[in-house]
Amino acid sequence: MSKMRVYEYAKKNNVPSKDVIHKLKEMNIEVTNHMATLEPEVVEKLDHTYNKKNERPQASAPKEKQKAPVKPKNYVDDFDDEDEEVVKTKVPKKKSANKKKEGKKHDLQLQQQEKKIFHQQKKKIKGKAKAKEQQPVQQEQPMKKEKELPKKITFEGTLTVAELAKKLGREPSEIIKKLFMLGVMATINQELDKDAIELICSDYGVEVEEKVVIDETNFESIEIVDDPEDLVERPPVVTIMGHVDHGKTTLLDSIRHSKVTEQEAGGITQHIGAYQVTVNDKKITFLDTPGHEAFTTMRARGAQVTDIVVLVVAADDGVMPQTVEAINHAKAANVPIIVAINKMDKPDANPDRVMQELMEYNLIPEEWGGDTIFCKLSAKTGEGIDNLLEMILLVSEMEELKANPNRRATGTVIEAKLDKGRGPVATLLVQAGTLHVGDPIVVGCTYGRVRAMVNDTGRRVKEAGPSTPVEITGLHEVPQAGDRFMVFEDEKKARQIGEARAQKQLMEQRNMKARVSLDDLFEQIKQGEMKELNIIVKADVQGSVEALVAALQKIEVEGVRVKIIHAAVGAITESDILLATTSNAIVIGFNVRPDANAKRVAESEKVDIRLHRIIYKVIEEIEAAMKGMLDPEYEEKVIGQAEVRQTFKVSKVGTIAGCYVTDGKITRDSKVRLIRQGIVVYEGEIDSLKRFKDDVKEVMQGYECGLTIKNFNDIKEGDVIEAYIMQEVERK
């Protein structure tokens, strides 16, 4: 016996589908509707049930059971049979044949009409039967259970009615009804404020929590407080600073046992490099900051990310200008300093002289009663290197350097470049958390996904913990050295924040105050009531520098003072321009020229450079510019007089004075004073000036006009109206 559906079985046994489904449920057989399939065993059980029920009626009328259902007459078949008979029994008589043909035609039309009516009736009966079968099944479907209410919901800012309904697991119409009962007319897409959300949720007994929205675009200012239990010890980040050619890179080369110096042009470090070494099973991260004075800003950045500064001073050379700069940067960053006295292998080495010179900068050796660690070493021979590394680890332990590796990574860009094969490449120093390959990241004003990570030895790594320098690829643009980076939960969020930061930077650049120049000093430098002109002086010899500084400081103009922020011997360099950029200063060159880099940066940063060969020309130019900075002096200039000959009072306008211009002219934008019998009654501005019915800008001598004075109506015949302007006068 084959499978059959519920409705087929019901039709076969002449019973409703509802009855069959009911019987199946009594037999503990689950079916959903009349289209459900019945297995042969189930059909046998149903047959057994229905046979028992119908035993008596079958015995009394056995013939009825065998009777086939009455089929509708097939008029088409009958017609075919008749047609055959007509063909077989042809009659030679023409008249009788014609009559038969006409009758056949008439019968055919009747049969077609009856057949059409029959099919229409059949369709109606089938449709009604189907509807009857489906109706009870639909009624028996179980009702939807309401979802359980959540104990607590969270939201940011606002929620629409649809969003709130989704969070509560209710229909939006139900929420709209509740709001209506509370007196709030709302639609499905209407936003609800915090009060409305709390009212609805309290009605359902659900707790509400509002998430505080943090502006993640400014992630540098976000301070994440870690649990002390999550903090682990991290390697110290050490910056090696010092004067050019004092042996910084050679020292690092000795520590790493690699030839870094040979790869660099001229033996001078071109970029900040980051390297990691292992000492006594502990790691130390080194940043090699360029020592040349042209890289002032790079050195300042190096001090910001470092934990310990190793100040390299040559034993045979002593303290130099760049040494002092390095000390100032380290102190500004509040970073402990370890002094490494290098080149001890040289015959003219004098470490005591170096110690004596450094005492002037408050770096006193421990052996002389101070707290600064001094290490005597030779980077060339390797003498004293181990002692220096031990001192670095000792200071690191004292500083208790710790970080949480189990959170999203943050840190700083050490350097960045555009590689022809790999695209934007950035060297990052991870300062907190762990950076993984595949992390969505925002770096400065760009974003991307960490595609690959390479450590300082050139090996690919999958993750980098705190104080680890790595080179990454996968950014959309090249970031700036010194930019901060942060990892986000997904690339979509990283892209949004990166684009928002780029847009913000663009707006800041547009609104950035223009650099000061001697041509527009009056417009550019105003800080409250205090006027100040910042100047950087560069000259060919020290005598010229001193003479120029003294002459500039003697310039006396009321309310303005000269501030020399930097004065030195030598050509105008890139670092001078960068200093002028940050301090909004003018650069004056005396018998010197700017180098190519300085010119390029000055053009891009709009820094004003003035070059002179004669000192008094410098003084004259600066003095003239400073005088222009002062608030201008004004004097009054009378431009005309008019006599009031008649007055008219108009409601909502006031008193109109009919005047005759006796001298000069009266202008629409001039100020006026009303004089009555030689006494000034009122000073103010003209509200309107007309000739006849037309507004005019001015009325010349000998013409009549009508005018009103702003906020004044006490005008009488015979009054004199004097027009004047305030004219700027050059300060002497």
From Swiss-Prot:
Keywords: Cytoplasm, GTP-binding, Initiation factor, Nucleotide-binding, Protein biosynthesis. It holds the Pfam family EF-G_D2. Residues 90-103, 118-129 have a biased composition (Basic residues). Residues 378-380 are annotated as: G5. Residues 242-249 are annotated as: G1. Residues 233-402 form the tr-type G domain. Residues 40-147 are annotated as: Disordered. It is found in: Cytoplasm. Residues 342-345 are annotated as: G4. Residues 42-67, 104-117 have a biased composition (Basic and acidic residues). GO terms for molecular function: GTP binding; GTPase activity; translation initiation factor activity. The keyword Translocase does not apply. GTP binds at residues 242-249, 288-292, 342-345. Transmembrane segments: none annotated. Residues 267-271 are annotated as: G2. One of its GO terms (cellular component) is cytosol. It comes from the Bacteria. Residues 288-291 are annotated as: G3. PANTHER family: TR-TYPE G DOMAIN-CONTAINING PROTEIN (PTHR43381:SF5), TRANSLATION INITIATION FACTOR IF-2-RELATED (PTHR43381). HAMAP family: IF_2_B. Belongs to the TRAFAC class translation factor GTPase superfamily. Classic translation factor GTPase family. IF-2 subfamily. One of the essential components for the initiation of protein synthesis. Protects formylmethionyl-tRNA from spontaneous hydrolysis and promotes its binding to the 30S ribosomal subunits. Also involved in the hydrolysis of GTP during the formation of the 70S ribosomal complex. This is Translation initiation factor IF-2. The gene is infB.
